[in-house]
C-alpha cells in the first residue's frame, strides 16, 4: 500500500501546489472535480458511481449516472492462472483527493484478492488541469511477484444516447454509422478500421469525443456499446508485459473524453488535431518532409493489372491522354497468383522490365506491388530461411494465419524479427536495382492490424504495445537510408496514422460504402497538411454508372490524388465521359499544389441553388455539385467547386456568392 501511495505522489509531483482555477472537493456526499470547462461528480459512498459529467452546458451521463463497471483486467499468474477481475470481485475503498499547483486528481481504489498474500489495489486516477478542456483517465494495479496484466478494458464510461445519435469511426477516410438500441461499433487501431485513436458520437445536441493520447501507437480497440438508452465508451488494450514492472501495472498514456454542442468536425479539430502535432508521425507538414518529388506531382494514378500486350497498349493510350507525371501502381507482375508465394516475387513475368522502361519514357512513375506483412508457409523460402521463427505468435504459441481469396494460408510476420527484416530489405533492393522502378508499394503495413506477439526470439516484450509500429519505423528508416535514392518512393495501403511520416504516399481505398454507412472526411480534417494520400474506394468494374465520376469529385475535394483506375477499363470507348472528367480534374489539381502540398482541408460544403441530386449505386445519393473549403500554404481560404454532371449549374456558396460551374469541371474561388 505504501508503495502505491508513493507511486501516486511521484505521478502527481510533475504538477507542483493547487491553483484556484481547478478544484477538487468532498461536499454533500460527492467528490467534485471542476475547472472553468468541466465538472465531474462522483459519489462518495460504499459503491463507486460516476454521477455527472458536465461540459458545455450539458450533463452527458444518464440520469442514474454511469452505472457500468469502470474497469476490467485480465491477470496472468506464474502457474498459468488467468482470472478476469472487475470491481465486484474486490472491496471498494472509496476515493481520495490529490492536489497540485496546476491540476487536481481523484483516486478511486479497489482491493483485490490475487493469492494468499496481502490484497492488491487497483486504482483509477481522474486528473483535471487548471486550464484543461478534457479530463484524463489512467489506471494502475499492483500484484504479487510473477504476475502480469495481459488485457485491460478501461475506461468504461456510459453516456446518454439521444434518439438519432450516430457514431463516427476512423475507418478509412472516416465513416458514420447508425447507432442502434443494441450491439456495438468497434475500431481497431492501428489499421484501416482504426486509422486514428478516437471515436465520436454526435446528434443534434452536440458531440461526445473519446480518445487515447498515445504517442507510441500501441494497439487498442475502441468500442461504443449500446445498452438501452445509454452508450458505453470502452478502450480495450492487449498489454505489453513490459507495462508490469516491480509488481505494478500501468497503461502508458491518458484516455480523454469531452463534449461540445458543436459538430463532430469541430470536436475532432479542436481536440485531436493538436495532439497529433506532439507525435513523431504528425510533427512535420508535407513541405517539411523528404518526400519524393514525383510523388508530390503525381496528381493521378493508374493501376495496371497484368503484364501483357493488352495492358501495355492501354497504358500507352492513358499516358498519351493524361500526360507526364502519372503514377502507376502495378499489380500481378510476379509469376504466382495474387496472395500466394509471398515473398517470392522473382523472377518477374517476361516483358515487365521492358514495360517499366517504356512507361517511364512516356513520363510515368512505377511502384510495383509487394506485401509487407505476409509470408506463405508453403514457400521454399519459409523453410530455408526458417520463416517460422519470424512469424508472429499468439500467447498459446500458435501462428497468426490469414486466408484471402486465393484460399492459400499466409502467416503474419513480426516486424521486429531480423529474419523478416532482411527478407523485406532484400525484396526492396532487388526491385529497385534490377527492375529500376521509381519506388515500391508495400501492402498491408498501413492497413492490417498490429498483432500482439509472444515469441521469445524477436527482441520485444511479450504482448502488445508500441514495439510493432516502432519496429516498422526502424526498418523503413533503415531502408530509406541505405536502399532508396532521393527520388524513389515508399508507398503503402491505407492510412494508419503512426506510419504517416514513413511513407511518401498512402493509398486509401478501404472505407466502407453502402446504405448503412456514410463516408466522412475525418482523416483530411486532421492530416491533410501532413500526409499525401490517393484513392477513395476500390474502383468498381462498372465505372459508367456515375460511380467513378462521384469518386473523382470526392477525391479532389478531400485532397486525394486521383484515379487508381485500371487503364484498360478507363480507356474503353464507353468510358469517354469518365476519362474526360478525370482528365479535367487532374489538370485542375495540378494547379492547386498550394492547397494539397501543405495546405489544409477545412470543411466539405453542399452548395445550394441549382444543384440536383443523383443516386450513385453502392454509394449514396449526392448533389451533383459539391465543394470544399481549403486553406492554402500561405493561409488563403478558398472554395473548390466541382460539377460531376453533364450540364452546367449555378449554385450558391456559404458566403452567398453565386457561381456557375461548367459541366464536368472544377473551379477555385477565394472565400
Swiss-Prot record:
InterPro entries, A to Z: DUF6259 (IPR046226)
Domain of life assignment: Bacteria
Keywords, sorted A to Z: Glycosidase, Hydrolase, Signal
EC numbers for this chain: 3.2.1.-
This protein's record includes keyword Ligase: no
One GO molecular-function entry: hydrolase activity, acting on glycosyl bonds
Signal peptide coordinates: 1-24
Keyword Cell cycle included in the entry's annotation: no
Pfam families assigned: DUF6259
Enzyme class of the recorded protein, top EC level: hydrolase
Family: Belongs to the glycoside hydrolase-like 3 (GHL3) family.
Protein name: Putative glycoside hydrolase BT_3595
Amino acid at each position: 500500500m505504501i508503495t502505491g501511495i508513493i507511486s501516486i505522489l511521484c505521478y502527481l509531483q510533475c504538477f507542483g501546489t493547487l491553483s484556484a482555477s481547478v478544484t477538487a472537493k468532498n461536499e454533500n456526499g460527492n467528490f467534485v472535480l471542476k475547472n472553468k470547462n468541466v465538472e465531474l461528480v462522483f459519489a462518495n459512498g460504499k459503491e463507486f458511481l460516476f454521477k455527472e459529467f458536465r461540459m458545455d452546458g450539458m450533463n452527458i451521463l444518464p440520469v442514474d449516472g454511469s452505472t457500468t463497471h469502470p474497469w476490467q483486467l485480465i491477470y496472468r499468474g506464474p502457474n498459468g492462472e488467468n482470472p478476469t477481475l472487475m470491481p465486484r470481485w474486490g472491496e471498494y475503498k472509496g476515493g481520495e483527493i490529490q492536489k497540485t499547483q496546476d491540476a487536481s486528481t481523484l483516486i478511486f481504489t479497489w482491493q483485490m484478492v490475487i493469492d494468499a498474500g496481502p490484497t492488491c489495489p487497483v486504482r483509477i486516477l481522474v486528473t483535471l488541469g487548471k486550464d484543461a478542456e478534457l479530463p484524463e483517465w489512467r489506471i494502475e494495479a499492483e500484484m504479487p511477484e510473477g504476475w502480469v496484466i495481459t488485457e485491460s478494458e478501461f475506461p468504461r464510461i456510459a453516456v446518454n444516447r439521444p434518439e438519432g445519435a450516430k457514431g463516427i469511426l476512423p475507418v478509412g477516410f472516416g465513416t458514420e454509422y447508425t447507432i442502434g438500441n443494441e450491439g456495438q461499433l468497434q475500431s481497431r487501431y492501428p489499421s484501416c478500421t482504426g486509422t486514428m485513436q478516437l471515436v465520436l458520437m454526435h446528434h443534434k445536441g452536440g458531440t461526445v469525443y473519446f480518445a487515447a493520447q498515445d504517442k507510441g501507437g500501441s494497439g487498442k480497440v475502441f468500442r461504443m456499446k449500446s445498452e438501452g438508452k445509454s452508450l458505453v465508451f470502452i478502450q480495450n488494450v492487449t498489454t505489453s508485459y513490459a507495462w508490469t514492472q516491480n509488481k505494478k501495472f500501468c497503461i502508458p498514456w491518458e484516455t480523454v473524453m469531452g463534449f461540445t454542442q458543436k459538430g463532430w468536425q469541430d470536436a475532432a479539430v479542436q481536440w485531436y488535431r493538436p495532439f497529433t502535432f506532439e507525435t513523431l508521425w504528425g510533427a512535420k507538414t508535407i513541405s517539411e518532409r523528404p518526400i519524393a518529388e514525383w510523388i508530390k506531382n503525381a496528381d493521378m494514378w493508374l493501376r495496371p493489372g497484368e503484364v501483357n500486350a493488352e495492358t501495355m497498349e492501354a497504358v500507352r493510350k492513358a499516358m498519351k491522354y493524361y500526360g507526364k507525371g502519372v503514377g502507376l501502381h502495378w499489380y500481378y507482375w510476379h509469376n504466382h497468383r495474387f496472395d500466394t508465394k509471398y515473398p517470392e516475387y522473382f523472377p518477374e513475368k517476361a516483358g515487365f522490365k521492358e514495360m517499366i522502361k517504356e512507361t517511364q519514357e512516356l513520363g510515368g512513375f512505377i511502384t510495383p506491388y509487394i506485401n509487407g506483412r505476409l509470408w506463405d508457409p508453403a514457400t521454399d523460402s519459409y523453410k530455408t530461411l526458417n520463416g517460422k521463427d519470424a512469424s508472429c505468435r499468439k500467447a498459446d504459441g500458435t501462428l497468426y494465419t490469414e486466408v484471402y481469396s486465393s484460399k492459400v494460408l499466409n502467416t503474419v510476420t513480426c516486424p521486429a524479427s531480423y529474419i523478416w527484416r532482411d527478407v523485406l530489405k532484400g525484396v526492396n533492393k532487388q526491385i529497385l536495382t534490377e527492375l529500376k522502378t521509381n519506388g515500391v508499394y508495400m501492402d498491408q503495413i498501413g492497413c492490417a492490424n498490429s498483432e500482439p506477439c509472444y515469441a521469445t526470439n524477436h527482441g520485444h516484450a511479450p504482448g502488445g504495445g508500441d514495439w510493432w509500429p516502432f519496429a516498422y519505423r526502424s526498418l523503413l528508416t533503415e531502408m530509406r537510408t541505405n536502399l532508396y535514392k532521393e527520388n524513389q518512393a515508399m508507398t503503402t495501403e491505407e492510412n494508419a496514422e503512426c506510419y504517416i511520416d514513413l511513407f511518401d504516399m498512402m493509398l486509401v481505398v478501404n472505407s466502407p460504402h453502402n446504405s448503412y454507412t456514410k463516408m466522412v472526411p475525418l482523416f483530411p480534417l486532421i492530416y491533410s497538411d501532413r500526409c499525401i494520400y490517393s484513392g477513395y474506394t476500390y474502383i468498381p468494374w462498372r465505372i459508367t454508372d456515375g460511380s467513378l465520376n462521384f469518386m473523382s469529385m470526392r477525391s479532389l475535394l478531400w485532397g486525394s490524388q486521383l484515379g487508381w483506375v485500371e487503364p484498360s477499363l478507363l480507356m474503353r470507348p464507353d468510358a469517354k465521359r469518365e476519362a474526360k472528367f478525370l482528365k479535367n480534374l487532374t489538370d485542375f489539381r495540378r494547379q492547386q499544389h498550394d492547397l494539397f502540398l501543405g495546405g489544409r482541408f477545412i470543411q466539405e460544403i453542399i452548395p445550394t441553388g441549382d444543384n440536383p441530386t443523383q443516386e450513385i449505386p453502392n454509394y449514396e445519393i449526392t448533389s451533383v455539385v459539391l465543394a470544399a473549403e481549403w486553406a492554402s500554404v500561405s493561409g488563403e481560404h478558398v472554395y473548390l467547386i466541382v460539377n460531376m454532371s453533364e450540364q452546367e449549374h449555378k449554385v450558391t456558396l456559404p458566403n452567398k456568392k453565386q457561381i456557375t460551374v461548367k459541366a464536368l469541371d472544377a473551379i477555385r474561388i477565394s472565400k
